[in-house]
């Protein structure tokens, strides 16, 4: 039943919903494990040492390696929903809640920096590759200390991406269904890719190699979580016997429904009732 989604998303690198209750005013409260800080706060206070960059990236990919085969996509990964405690344990929060939030409220700006280009170019079905893009942006920010693609708005967002990656490849342009978007992309100045080594002079060859595979313009060419976690850069942490994969797909189709918020409350409530029986 609907209880699937939360019940089966139990993983060390994902925040578990420990308890949920609905107040008399029918607000939904998610009581989650509390972790010390988030990556956004951590990055704004000081540059990260290399071993932390590595370990944090590993844990993010470990979470995605688990959920992606189940057909679950976060869609809104950014440093502020990556929680970290004093032992450097990392957990991703807000899985499956991205659609519940009102875009006006979520501080669209911070989110935009981490949005995959295909979301802006097509607005149609997109898949787990969008999470890999977001984690690639977060990886770059951990290396460099500042956001890699700080777009001021939708249009500027694509411009800053092309300034580093060069013009979108043909196979990406061919997926664009909207004529307006197509015209916009055709009007962008033709750009060559800038070598990542030039943009990130302090990064190691292994870091650069993995980063380029994660920030591929074409979602179909972009590396998967399962492949990224096996990259030599993450060898110190990679342990196939300790990287579980969700063993069944579950249906979050209700998550795509465009429902008024009061209906969401009822739905979430039923989901939670079912979940709490386990």
Swiss-Prot record:
Top-level enzyme category: transferase
Q: Protein kinase domain: which residues?
A: 1-234
Q: Which is an annotated Pfam family here?
A: Pkinase
Q: Tell me a Gene Ontology molecular-function term this record carries.
A: ATP binding
Task: List every position bearing Phosphothreonine.
Answer: 106
Motif stretch (TXY): 106-108
List the PROSITE patterns: PROTEIN_KINASE_DOM, PROTEIN_KINASE_ST
Instruction: Provide the protein's localization.
Output: Cytoplasm; Nucleus
Has UniProt tagged this entry with the keyword Ribosomal protein? no
Which positions bear Phosphotyrosine?
Answer: 108
Reaction(s) catalysed by this chain, per the record, are: L-seryl-[protein] + ATP = O-phospho-L-seryl-[protein] + ADP + H(+); L-threonyl-[protein] + ATP = O-phospho-L-threonyl-[protein] + ADP + H(+)
Spell out the post-translational modification annotation for this entry: Dually phosphorylated on Thr-106 and Tyr-108, which activates the enzyme.
UniProt GO cellular component terms: cytoplasm; nucleus
EC numbers listed for it are 2.7.11.24
Instruction: Tell me which InterPro entries the record gives.
Output: Kinase-like_dom_sf (IPR011009), MAP_kinase (IPR050117), MAPK_p38-like (IPR008352), Prot_kinase_dom (IPR000719), Ser/Thr_kinase_AS (IPR008271)
**Activation and inhibition:** Activated by tyrosine and threonine phosphorylation.
Swiss-Prot/TrEMBL keywords = Activator, ATP-binding, Cytoplasm, Kinase, Nucleotide-binding, Nucleus, Phosphoprotein, Serine/threonine-protein kinase, Transcription, Transcription regulation, Transferase
The prosthetic group or cofactor this protein requires is: Mg(2+)
Q: Which family does it belong to?
A: Belongs to the protein kinase superfamily. Ser/Thr protein kinase family. MAP kinase subfamily. HOG1 sub-subfamily.
Briefly state the protein's biological role: Proline-directed serine/threonine-protein kinase involved in a signal transduction pathway that is activated by changes in the osmolarity of the extracellular environment. Controls osmotic regulation of transcription of target genes.
Q: Supply the domain comment.
A: The TXY motif contains the threonine and tyrosine residues whose phosphorylation activates the MAP kinases.
Q: What is this protein called?
A: Mitogen-activated protein kinase HOG1
């Amino acid at each position: 039943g609907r209880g699937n989604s939360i019940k089966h998303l139990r993983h060390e690198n994902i925040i578990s919903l420990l308890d949920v209750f609905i107040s008399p005013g029918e607000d939904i409260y998610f009581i989650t494990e509390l972790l010390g800080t988030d990556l956004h706060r951590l990055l704004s206070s000081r540059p990260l040492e290399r071993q932390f960059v590595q370990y944090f990236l590993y844990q993010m990919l470990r979470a995605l390696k688990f959920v992606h085969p189940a057909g679950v996509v976060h869609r809104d990964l950014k440093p502020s929903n990556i929680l970290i405690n004093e032992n450097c344990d990392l957990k991703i929060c807000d899985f499956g809640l991205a659609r519940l939030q009102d875009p006006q409220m979520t501080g669209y700006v911070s989110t935009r920096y981490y949005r995959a280009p295909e979301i802006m170019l097509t607005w149609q079905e997109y898949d787990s590759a969008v999470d890999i893009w977001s984690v690639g942006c977060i990886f770059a920010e951990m290396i460099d200390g500042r956001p890699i693609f700080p777009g001021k708005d939708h249009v500027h967002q694509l411009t800053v991406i092309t300034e580093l990656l060069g013009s979108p490849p043909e196979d990406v342009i061919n997926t664009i269904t909207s004529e307006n978007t197509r015209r916009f992309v055709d009007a962008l100045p033709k750009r060559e890719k800038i070598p990542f080594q030039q943009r990130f002079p302090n990064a190691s060859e292994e870091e650069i190699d993995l980063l380029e595979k994660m920030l591929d313009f074409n979602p179909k060419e972009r590396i998967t979580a399962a492949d990224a976690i096996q990259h030599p850069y993450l060898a110190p942490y990679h342990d196939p016997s300790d990287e579980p994969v969700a063993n069944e797909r579950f249906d979050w189709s209700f998550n795509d429904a465009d429902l008024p918020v009061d209906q969401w409350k009822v739905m979430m409530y039923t989901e939670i009732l079912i979940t709490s029986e386990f």
